């Protein structure tokens, strides 16, 4: 999973507040900068694969289908042959979540967008949760959820109810699948804007690190308990981007088996720069405020072995 940090094209989307990422805006978002951003995202994804690119890549902060078309067809990633699915959310800025997939190892069966009805909570619209169903080589179905939870704008305490509400929608969907499938292979990835010990993850989803005996129909967070992080705030690393799987995926029933040790946060040197204020390293961002910096993203990418799927024959 990778939060690509504001992947916008240079064209205005009707009814969306994307004005800060237009050529005549103070940030000066040009075609050259847009294509450089695409090339950098492609570089990160290719680097994660070593010999082969990942079979599945979840993304968030993608503006639209046009951006993904350019990423998969007009960037160095074009040789990988990815296909993709993306939500069409009511988010005011127009950003969405998406999943890249390899057709040779993941046969798309269907997709669904889970909307988050915020009118009753007097909250502005947020991103839909993407649910993608695919068949893998074993013949089993892999259910993948990609999410980007409401931000911490206004403070953690004030904004928490919105993340709890969104997590409840995700939990209902995941729980129904876990109880429906004979082989519940469920993977949840995304920017939760919460840490592993926060209530949206630890209580609503009940997802903690796998310790002791694993239960097939429970959720486990492979990012819980990590010393390293995906995001740095005021000199401290933390994990806001989570990778959660069903216990069935941890029990080794088929080729998709994973483990806590096989999940990694990748800190490639080219993704980092010196933190001049707090010391140490910090992710190299595309913008610092309104100043173009030409980096990669505010977050690091994480991977897990379930993205290594056998080829479907």
Where are these regions (language model features)?
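Active-site metal-binding loops of divalent metal-dependent hydrolases
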Residues: 4-7, 62, 149, 191-192
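Single conserved hydrophobic/aromatic residue that forms the stacking wall/gate
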Residues: 301-302, 309-312
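Metal-dependent phosphoesterases centered on the DNase I-like endonuclease/exonuclease/phosphatase
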Residues: 164-262, 266
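Short, solvent-exposed beta-strand-terminating loops
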Residues: 1-17, 262-271
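Metal-dependent phosphoester/phosphodiester hydrolase catalytic core
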Residues: 15, 137-168, 172
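Structured beta-strand-rich core segments of catalytic domains in phosphoester-bond hydrolases
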Residues: 62-149
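Acidic, Ser/Thr/Pro-rich beta/coil linker or hinge segments at domain junctions
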Residues: 254-297
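Acidic/histidine-rich helix-loop elements
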Residues: 6-37, 153-162
């Amino acid at each position: 999973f990778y939060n690509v940090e504001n992947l916008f094209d240079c064209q205005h989307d009707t009814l969306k507040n994307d004005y800060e990422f237009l050529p005549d805006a103070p940030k000066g978002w040009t075609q050259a900068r847009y294509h450089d951003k695409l090339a950098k995202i492609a570089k990160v994804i290719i680097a994660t694969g070593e010999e082969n690119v990942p079979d599945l890549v979840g993304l968030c902060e993608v503006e639209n289908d046009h951006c993904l078309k350019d990423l998969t067809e007009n960037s160095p990633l074009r040789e990988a042959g990815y296909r993709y699915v993306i939500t069409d959310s009511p988010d005011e800025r127009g950003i969405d979540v998406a999943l890249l997939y390899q057709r040779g190892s993941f046969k798309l069966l269907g997709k669904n967008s889970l909307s988050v009805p915020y009118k009753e909570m007097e909250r502005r619209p947020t991103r839909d949760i993407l649910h993608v169903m695919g068949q893998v080589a074993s013949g089993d179905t892999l259910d993948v959820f990609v999410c980007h939870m409401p931000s911490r704008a206004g403070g953690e305490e004030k904004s928490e109810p919105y993340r709890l509400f969104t997590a409840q929608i995700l939990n209902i969907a995941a729980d129904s699948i876990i109880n429906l499938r004979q082989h519940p292979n469920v993977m949840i990835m995304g920017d939760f804007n919460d840490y592993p010990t926060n209530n949206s993850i630890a209580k609503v989803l009940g997802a903690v690190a796998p310790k002791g005996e694993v239960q097939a129909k429970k959720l486990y967070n492979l990012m819980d308990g990590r010393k390293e992080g995906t995001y740095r705030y005021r000199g401290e690393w933390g994990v806001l981007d989570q990778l959660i799987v069903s216990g069935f995926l941890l029990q080794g029933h088929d080729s998709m088996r994973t483990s806590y040790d096989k999940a990694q946060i990748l800190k490639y040197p080219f993704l980092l720069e010196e933190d001049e204020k707090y010391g140490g390293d910090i992710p190299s961002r595309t913008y610092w405020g309104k100043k173009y910096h030409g980096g990669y993203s505010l977050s690091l990418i994480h991977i897990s072995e379930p993205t290594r799927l056998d080829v479907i024959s």
